[in-house]
């Protein structure tokens, strides 16, 4: 899959699939898809996108990711556009330095 096909799939197929389940609207507070752009003097990134999903709590995050709807409708779609052997996930807490 080309990078352009990946971006299209993530925007037009996978994101709507996620947003269609009620748990997404209930638990996600902010959802950001970022795609690399050419930048002089910077090497090509190792990833095709960065996805940020923000939640009020770890419990809310788990309520989404372990919900029946997510496990049956959203998670199985990952193999259609992601290389699961090279994908990473970070759970983090934000520390604002400049606002």
What are these regions (language model features)?
Residues 1-99:
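Macromolecular interaction modules
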């Amino acid at each position: 899959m080309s990078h352009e096909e990946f971006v299209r799939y993530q925007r037009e197929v996978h994101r709507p699939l996620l947003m269609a389940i009620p748990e997404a609207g209930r638990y996600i507070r902010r959802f950001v898809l970022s795609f690399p752009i050419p930048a002089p003097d910077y090497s090509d990134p190792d990833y095709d996108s960065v996805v940020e999903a923000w939640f009020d709590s770890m419990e809310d995050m788990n309520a989404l990711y372990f919900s029946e709807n997510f496990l049956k409708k959203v998670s199985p779609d990952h193999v259609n556009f992601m290389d699961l052997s090279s994908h990473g996930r970070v759970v983090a807490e934000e520390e604002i330095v400049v606002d």
